[in-house]
Amino acid sequence: MSGHSKWHTIKHKKGAADAKRGKIFTRIIKELTVAARAGGGDIDTNPRLRTIVAEAKSVNMPADNIKRAIQRGTGELPGVSYEEITYEGYGPGGAALIIETLTDNKNRTVGEMRHLLGKYGGNRAAENSVAWMFDKKGYIVVDKAKTDEDALMSAALDAGADDLRDDGDSWEIVSTPDAFQKVLEAVKGLGIEPGAAEIAMLPQNYVKLEGKPAQQMVKLMDILEDHEDSKKVWSNADIEEKEIEASLA
C-alpha cells in the first residue's frame, strides 16, 4: 500500500470521531464558501463546488448548511471571508510537507503553523522548495472487492483517467485534475462508492521513516490536520501501517 493510501485509510477510521466533533463539517463549510466565491454557486458550472458538495453529502451534512455556506460565498448571505494559503515544510527525518489552509487571519495561521512544525521536529520551507516533489492529480481509491477490474479499467480510462494502479486490497485511479470529476462520475456509474476521491498532491518519491522520526511525523501530521485552519496535509513520508496506528492510538 502506498504511503498516501496507508495514511488516508487509517485517518478515515479515525474520521468518524472527528466528524462528531464537527471538524470535518467546519472544513467543508469553509471550502464550500471559497469555491462558491471563486466560481459561482451553480454546481453544474462549477466543478470544484460540485466535488465539495458531494463530499458534504457523503458525511451527511444537512442541506441547509450546504446552501448557507454557498450563499455566503456568492454574497447572498453575509459571512467571514476565507483565504487559501499553502505552506511548505519539512518534518522529522527530512520528509516533505505541504499544508493547505483556509483562514480568515493569515498572520495567526502562519505563526501557528510555524510553531507546530518546530514543536514536532520540523521546519517551514521557502515557497516552491517542496511543491516540486509532488504532482497535483485526481485520486480515487476503490476497494477491489467492490468491482470487476476490467469494468473499472474500461470506465476509468474511457472517462480520461491516466492510470489504474494495483495497491494491494484496492485500486488507485489517477487522472489530471481536469478529468477528475468525469472519472469520478464514471466510477460511481458502476454503482461503486469510492473509499477516497480527491484532488491530491501525490509524491513523486517517498522517504522511508521508522522509529522515533516516524512517530514524530505521524503526530505532526495528525495535529496539523486537526488544526482549525487546516484543509489538507500532504507528505512524502512512507511509514509502516502499524507505526501509524500506534502513534495515533
Residue ranges, per PLM feature:
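Positively charged, low-complexity, intrinsically disordered RNA-binding extensions
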Residues: 139-249
